[in-house]
């Protein structure tokens, strides 16, 4: 790869990794093209990006943003703003491809995290699920109050 192309890639990644909240990385050794395409499709649907990047270029891009990270072997980098949804996608992919896809860690809000952290994040509810829970909790007392009023009205009408 030419030096100018490498510089361009590093600049692009530095901007991406600055603007994005989280970057996951995983070993994809042994993955088929079909498996990687399925992962990329799922990531795109979650408005994220997935790309195989040379470790040195990724390390420099992170260093440009003040993050010290070391990468070994083959890595696919997955990044986007919705860290919980992306964590769920890659954890599900890792479970379905245990021998060929291993989550190594993540860089979330400027901190390097391990694979166990990614697994814990994947168990959290997504933003949409949380909003649904809040809406349900807000609706429940109103529904109970309306039910009580209806029973009171029925009782008054029957008297």
Swiss-Prot record:
Name of the protein in its database record: Large ribosomal subunit protein uL10
**What is this protein for, i.e. what is its function?**
Forms part of the ribosomal stalk, playing a central role in the interaction of the ribosome with GTP-bound translation factors.
Q: Fetch the PANTHER family from UniProt.
A: 39S RIBOSOMAL PROTEIN L10, MITOCHONDRIAL
One GO molecular function term of this record is:
large ribosomal subunit rRNA binding
Q: What is the lineage of its organism?
A: Bacteria, Pseudomonadati, Campylobacterota, Epsilonproteobacteria, Nautiliales
Q: Which NCBIfam families match?
A: PRK00099.1-1
Q: Which residues form the signal peptide?
A: none
- Source species, domain of life: Bacteria
**What does the record list as GO biological process?**
translation
Family statement = Belongs to the universal ribosomal protein uL10 family.
Q: Quick one: which gene encodes this?
A: rplJ
Q: For this UniProt entry, what's an example GO CC term?
A: ribonucleoprotein complex
Pfam families linked to this entry: Ribosomal_L10
Q: Tell me which species this is from.
A: Nautilia profundicola (strain ATCC BAA-1463 / DSM 18972 / AmH)
Listed A to Z, the keywords are:
Ribonucleoprotein, Ribosomal protein, RNA-binding, rRNA-binding
Q: Quaternary structure per UniProt? A: Part of the ribosomal stalk of the 50S ribosomal subunit. The N-terminus interacts with L11 and the large rRNA to form the base of the stalk. The C-terminus forms an elongated spine to which L12 dimers bind in a sequential fashion forming a multimeric L10(L12)X complex.
């Amino acid at each position: 790869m030419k030096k100018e192309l490498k510089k361009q890639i590093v600049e692009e990644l530095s901007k991406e990794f600055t603007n994005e909240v989280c970057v996951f990385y995983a070993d994809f050794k042994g993955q088929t093209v079909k498996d990687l395409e399925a992962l990329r499709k799922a990531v795109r649907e979650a408005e994220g990006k997935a790309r195989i990047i040379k470790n040195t270029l990724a390390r420099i891009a992170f260093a440009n943003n003040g993050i010290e990270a070391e990468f070994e072997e083959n890595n696919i980098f997955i990044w986007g703003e919705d860290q919980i949804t992306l964590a769920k996608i890659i954890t599900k992919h890792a479970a379905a491809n245990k021998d060929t896809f291993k989550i190594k860690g993540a860089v979330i809000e400027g901190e390097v995290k391990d694979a166990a952290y990614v697994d814990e994040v994947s168990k959290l509810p997504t933003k949409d699920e949380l909003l649904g829970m809040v809406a349900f909790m807000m609706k429940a007392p109103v529904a109970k109050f309306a039910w009580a009023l209806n029973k009171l009205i029925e009782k008054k009408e029957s008297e």
